């Protein structure tokens, strides 16, 4: 007895040579060479490079403004973490 496959796949013909092409909705063409694209810093960057004179070294997070401080962890949260989530509040 011969089995008959119940799924009928449609023919899908692929190109023999896959070419890089832009997305149809792209507003710009692809560059001729991809090796020159990532060769330097982004051209749209507006931030100046950090120099030792302008950068600030902080050794403790508490020296930073409050928005950079760690949020306090309650005892109930610690119990939940230590129990692997099996702790009910």
Swiss-Prot record:
GO terms for cellular component: mitochondrial inner membrane; oxoglutarate dehydrogenase complex. InterPro entries: Kgd4/YMR-31 (IPR020373). Pfam families: Kgd4-YMR31. Its main location: mitochondrion. One of its GO terms (biological process) is 2-oxoglutarate metabolic process. It is found in: Mitochondrion. The keyword Mitochondrion applies. It comes from the Eukaryota. Keywords: Mitochondrion, Transit peptide. Belongs to the alpha-ketoglutarate dehydrogenase component 4 family. Component of the 2-oxoglutarate dehydrogenase complex (OGDC), also called alpha-ketoglutarate dehydrogenase (KGDH) complex. The copmplex is composed of the catalytic subunits OGDH (2-oxoglutarate dehydrogenase kgd1; also called E1 subunit), DLST (dihydrolipoamide succinyltransferase kgd2; also called E2 subunit) and DLD (dihydrolipoamide dehydrogenase dld1; also called E3 subunit), and the assembly factor KGD4. Within OGDC, interacts (via N-terminus) with E3 subunit and (via C-terminus) with the complex core formed by E1 and E2 subunits. Molecular adapter that is necessary to a form a stable 2-oxoglutarate dehydrogenase enzyme complex (OGDC). Required for incorporation of the E3 subunit (dld1) into the E1-E2 core (kgd1-kgd2) of mitochondrial OGDC, and acting as a stability factor for the fully assembled complex. This is Alpha-ketoglutarate dehydrogenase subunit 4, mitochondrial. The lineage of its organism: Eukaryota, Fungi, Dikarya, Ascomycota, Taphrinomycotina.
């Amino acid at each position: 007895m011969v089995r008959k496959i119940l799924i009928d796949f449609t023919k899908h013909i692929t190109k023999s040579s896959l070419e890089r092409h832009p997305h149809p909705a792209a507003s710009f063409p692809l560059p001729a060479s991809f090796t020159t694209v990532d060769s330097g810093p982004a051209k749209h960057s507006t931030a100046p490079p950090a120099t030792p004179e302008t950068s600030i070294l902080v050794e403790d997070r508490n020296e930073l403004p409050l928005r950079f401080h760690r949020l306090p962890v309650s005892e109930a949260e610690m119990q939940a973490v230590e129990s692997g989530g099996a702790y009910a509040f």
